[in-house]
């Protein structure tokens, strides 16, 4: 039984806790593993036990995983009350662009700097970036950093008020498309078919921007875990988090297959 199944916080004792400075902005990052670097960004409402479970799976597959603290309480079990407060704070934060018309979230510049540092420390052909929910699209924006060569966009939820939006300014969108085309990058993405926070309209917008470079995979909502933590049950209220809160850890399950596909994608690009 993991921490989420037990309703417990995760103490994160198997990661080193670092204070990482990017252009004078300092944030906490949890780091563990050996091998090429992968930046794994948390979903709302923070670095939950399920996010850490995914981080450990990536680490144990032969990567150095970097988990930046961007919002919420690190390691906290996601309750409905606390999660709603984290969402409210993030939506008015200057670091994020939660609503349509806001363009690219400024925090992605810091995350690109983290990717540069990870590549410098770990070497290899480049770095992977996994975004989840609120940070889902950040993995795509991070391809503006040359070291990021393996972006995974999981159930991106921003902008919250535009189901066909991409949380990208026009200039950044053009630059991302050019980078993807120039370097032959494939963008791997996942969502549930009945997710109201990441709809088919959003995936269609990615396809319009990126063409065949966008590999969007859709799982049936009926495959989602039926007893997720309270924040996902009471606030999210829909199948959403394919490889974290709504993952079913059973051999052969579609969500576990998605996890394995992500790890295989990272390995093919970062272990060469």
Role assignments for model-derived ranges:
Residues 1-272:
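N-terminal cap/leader regions of alpha/beta-hydrolase-fold enzymes
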């Amino acid at each position: 039984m993991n921490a989420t199944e037990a309703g417990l916080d995760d103490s994160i004792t198997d990661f080193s806790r670092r204070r990482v400075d990017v252009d004078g902005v300092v944030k906490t990052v949890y780091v563990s593993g050996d091998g090429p670097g992968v930046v794994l960004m948390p979903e709302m409402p923070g670095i939950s036990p399920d996010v850490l479970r995914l981080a450990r799976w990536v680490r144990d597959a032969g990567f150095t995983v970097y988990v930046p603290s961007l919002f919420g309480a690190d390691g906290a079990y996601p309750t409905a009350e606390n999660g709603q407060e984290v969402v409210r704070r993030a939506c008015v934060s200057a670091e994020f662009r939660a609503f349509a018309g806001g363009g690219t979230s400024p925090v992605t510049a810091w995350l690109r700097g983290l990717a540069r540092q990870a590549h410098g420390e770990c070497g290899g052909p480049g770095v992977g970036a996994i975004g989840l929910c609120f940070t889902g699209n950040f993995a795509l924006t991070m391809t503006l950093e040359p070291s990021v060569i393996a972006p995974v966009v999981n159930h991106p939820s921003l902008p919250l008020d535009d189901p066909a939006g991409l949380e990208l300014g026009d200039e950044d969108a053009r630059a991302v498309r050019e980078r993807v085309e120039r370097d032959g990058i494939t963008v791997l993405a996942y969502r549930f078919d009945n997710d109201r926070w990441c709809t088919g309209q959003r995936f269609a917008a990615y396809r319009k921007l990126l063409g065949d470079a966008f590999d969007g995979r859709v799982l049936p909502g009926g495959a989602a875990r039926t007893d997720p933590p309270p924040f996902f049950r009471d606030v999210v209220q829909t199948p959403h988090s394919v490889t974290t809160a709504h993952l079913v850890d059973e051999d052969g399950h579609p969500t576990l297959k998605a996890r394995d596909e992500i790890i295989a994608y990272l390995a093919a690009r970062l272990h060469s």
